[in-house]
Every structure is written in structure tokens, then in C-alpha cells.
């Protein structure tokens, strides 16, 4: 990540190699935290890190 604190959904799509619909699905399910600023959905850098950690933990359980 490039030092920003908040990322747009389009940026997170590229960072995580996921589609827009999957990103929003993860947000709805509570697995990926986000905030809303006006009409824009933003994802904190810490939420991205937490989500990656969650994926790694789930992968270890398999």
C-alpha cells in the first residue's frame, strides 16, 4: 500500500485482486470494514490489513 489512510473501492479491487461485487459482499458481511464519506465508500488501510490477516488465518485452518 502507498501510505494512504483511506482507499476507494476501485483501489481495493486492485490491491486485493477482487471484483467490485466481492468487495461489497465482504463489506456487507462485516469481514471488510468501511466508512462512508458523503456518497463515497472508503476502506481504511487498517481494515485492508485486518482483512488480509483474516484470510491468512482462514487459510491456515484448512
Spans of features found by a protein language model:
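A short, Lys/Arg-enriched interface patch at domain edges and termini
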Residues: 48-62
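Polyanion-binding surface elements
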Residues: 1-22, 53-54
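Major-groove DNA-recognition helix of helix-turn-helix-type DNA-binding domains
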Residues: 16-42
Amino acid at each position: 500500500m502507498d501510505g494512504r489512510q483511506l482507499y476507494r473501492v476501485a483501489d481495493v479491487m486492485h490491491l486485493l485482486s477482487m471484483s467490485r461485487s466481492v468487495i461489497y459482499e465482504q463489506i456487507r458481511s462485516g469481514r471488510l470494514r468501511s466508512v462512508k464519506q458523503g456518497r463515497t465508500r472508503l476502506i481504511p488501510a487498517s481494515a485492508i490489513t485486518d482483512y488480509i490477516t483474516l484470510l491468512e488465518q482462514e487459510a491456515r485452518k484448512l
